[in-house]
Amino acid sequence: FAFHQSALSEVDPAHPAYITFTSGSTGEPKGIVATHAPLVHFIEWHTQHHSLSKDDCFSLLSGLGHDPVYRDVFTPLSIGAKVFIPAQSTVIDPAALARWIHKNGISIVHLTPPLGKLIETGAKLQGARFSALRYLFWGGDALSLSLYEQMRVIAPNAVRVNFYGTTETPQAMAYHRVDPDADNARIPLGR
C-alpha cells in the first residue's frame, strides 16, 4: 500500500468554503455561499478572546446540516483540542447526555436554550455538577433568566456567553458575556 503525498493548492480567503441554507422564515430557504475569510476570522477571534486551548474538551452537539457545525469542528481542530461527538441516542436522552458531558470532562459547549434545558434536566436527574465546564456559548434562541440560573447551579465555574448571528453572517456578529452579579432579567443578544 503506497502512500503518495501531493501538495495542496493554496486557498484564497475569498473562495467559497461551504454552502448553508437560511431557515426560510421569509419564504423559501435560500442557499448562502460562505467564503473562508469570515469563518477563519471568527475562529481566530473566538479562540483568542476566550482563551480556548488545546487542553479544552469541546462537544459537537450541533446538527450536521446547521452552519454552527463548522464552528464546532474547526475551532477545536485549529488549536489541537479534542472534539467529542456523542451518539444520537445520547443527545436525545437527558440523563445519558449529562453522564456523557461529565465522563468526557467537556469544558466547552456551544448550545441552544432547548439543548441547555435538556442538559439541565439530565444533570438534575443524575445529581450531576459539571465542574470541568469552562464556557457555555449560547445561541439560536433567547436565553431566559430561569434557564440561565438553572445552568449556574449545575455548571458553577462556567462563563456564559450569549452569541447572536445569522446564516448570512457566519457564526456570530454580536456577543454578550453574562455577568453573574448583574441584573439579568433580560439577557442581551450582545454588541
Language-model features, listed with the residues they occupy:
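Short, Asp-centered acidic motifs that coordinate Mg2+ and/or phosphate
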Residues: C57, S107-I108, Y135, V159
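Short strand-turn motif at the edge of the Rossmann-like AdoMet-binding core
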Residues: L61-G63, A87-Q88, T112-P113, D141, ...
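Adenylate-forming AMP-binding core of the ANL superfamily, especially NRPS adenylation
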Residues: F1-E44, I85-P86, S131-R191
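Short gly/Ser/Thr-rich phosphate-binding loop of adenylate-forming enzymes
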Residues: V91-A98, P113-Q126, Y135-V159
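Conserved AMP-binding/adenylation subdomain of ANL enzymes
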Residues: K30-S59, H66-S107, H176
